[in-house]
């Protein structure tokens, strides 16, 4: 049985697209964790804040979770002195989506804890949790976040990453980070 010209043409297009998708996904996965330009200080600060959460896990505590407005605008020590309750400020950067903020603190919460979310305007108007800034940070210094996502969320994440960023990560890996 001979295939008609349009069928062969469409088959060739479908095969090319499938091979292109497999190649792109492979390069995307290869470059995750590449040492590219990113805000690594946020990772370091996040580790410290998680240690504070763990240290106060069994106590009733007050937690502020937001972006840099909380980071720069809320003095945890003063709040703690005024209220007599351990206070932890998880504020770091506006680019961290709300679901990320919530997932970050949830393992450390217990009944009686108070969480305050003084969110920035951008948190309310974001159309996707995967901004260019956020995906770059995750791929550079927090690949565990990507790997723990459900498959459909991994695909949403992958679709939100610019091809130029994938290329940058591949080049960094090939050059030995």
Segments the model singles out, each with a brief description of its role:
Residues 1-19:
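N-terminal Sec-pathway targeting helices
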Residues 49, 59-61, 110, 154, ...:
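Context-gated lysine
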Residues 65, 69-152:
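Membrane-embedded segments
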Residues 148-177:
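Extended, charge-rich helix/loop segments that form flexible
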